[in-house]
């Protein structure tokens, strides 16, 4: 059978999913809520821990192949796309707590006008990072689900449930997968011709 992620990498991955989910659920609705010193301190501590964990997670997880568990060779274009999505997710997950800490710092320094240049910019970065993280995570989850449907082994290397036992026999999924492979092959030919 193909390689699988280690138990520690699975724990890090799924614990972080819970932490991210908690961060979304507990987010503040209005900047004026930061007038509550206890809430402000909690937000600063949460953002600091979140940031440290994102960086530690990145440093730990980068040692693993992008498609660990794949039973078949993965096209280079697919690898680059996946790495781009992963890099984007990490960038968003670093910008979220960083901009959150900047918002808290600006707020404590008296910058409470959300329309102000500096605070408005930082709030914009924070909101954009959150929105982009939703999109990139949705792409990541969608790709993982498609991997499970294809039965290519990638899902099984990280997800502890609904493990696949081999490639699918479903003709519809096979057709989509074949089209996907053709697109990757055309993209590789395109980029190879540009290098010449």
What do these predicted regions represent?
Residues 1-196:
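Membrane-embedded alpha-helical bundles that constitute the cytochrome b-like, heme-associated redox core
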